[in-house]
Amino acid sequence: MLDVIELDFDYHDQPLLQQISFHLPAGGLLHLKGSNGAGKTTLLKLIAGLLNPEKGEILFERQSIKKDLCTYQKQLCFVGHRSGINPYLTLRENCLYDIHFSPGAVGITELCRLFSLEHLIDYPCGLLSSGQKRQVALLRLWMSKAKLWLLDEPLVALDELSLLTIITKIQEHRAKGGAVLLTSHQDLPLNKADYEEYHL
């Protein structure tokens, strides 16, 4: 599904990423690891087409993402440190905004129950905590048809139930042929044989 080939990126004229190469197949999960400042978030932004590399190429389904960036970006969903949530829209409206629904997608209320947010469904998201906004961003992810999920530190500061929910959704997405690339400082609660790791 995704091929990163000999990618280089400089930050303030200093090399940050050099010769980054890996393959992420359909159904795959790649855990991107590295210390703070190693370039994990930058690499996700490069893969999302939000930054341009100095050298190298990114292929999605064997085609360069540069060929039709707009179409490519509709195939992915990027959940980063910023939630991307509109504070003036309600939780429901944020989930519906610019979402490409899958046939038979689970209803918003049912998904909200996974994070015990159903009582806030018609509240403006500006009234939610930062953690709740991040959960809304994840709900949007789960409602999308995106094949490729790019998740920047999705497991930070989660309780055990929320962690289990996210891991379950990741596994469901993979079972349907989707692919997931995530960064995390912590080990994943999965068998090591069930995913790949890439160290920056």
Curated annotation (Swiss-Prot):
Binding site for ATP: G34, S35, N36, G37, A38, G39, K40, T41
Top EC class for this record: translocase
Reaction it catalyzes: heme b(in) + ATP + H2O = heme b(out) + ADP + phosphate + H(+)
A single cellular component GO annotation: plasma membrane
Any Pfam family hit: ABC_tran
Domain ABC transporter as annotated: residue spans: 2-200
An example molecular function term from Gene Ontology annotations: ABC-type heme transporter activity
Localization terms from the record: Cell inner membrane
This enzyme's EC code(s): 7.6.2.5
GO terms under biological process: cytochrome complex assembly
Alphabetically ordered keywords of this record: ATP-binding, Cell inner membrane, Cell membrane, Cytochrome c-type biogenesis, Membrane, Nucleotide-binding, Translocase, Transport
InterPro entries listed in its UniProt record: AAA+_ATPase, ABC_transporter-like_ATP-bd, ABC_transptr_haem_export_CcmA, P-loop_NTPase
Membrane topology category: Peripheral membrane protein
Major site of localization recorded for this protein: membrane
Superkingdom to which the source organism belongs: Bacteria
Record's function text: Part of the ABC transporter complex CcmAB involved in the biogenesis of c-type cytochromes; once thought to export heme, this seems not to be the case, but its exact role is uncertain. Responsible for energy coupling to the transport system.
Assembly notes: The complex is composed of two ATP-binding proteins (CcmA) and two transmembrane proteins (CcmB).
Protein family according to the UniProt entry: Belongs to the ABC transporter superfamily. CcmA exporter (TC 3.A.1.107) family.
Protein name (database record): Cytochrome c biogenesis ATP-binding export protein CcmA
Organism placement in taxonomy: Bacteria, Pseudomonadati, Pseudomonadota, Gammaproteobacteria, Legionellales
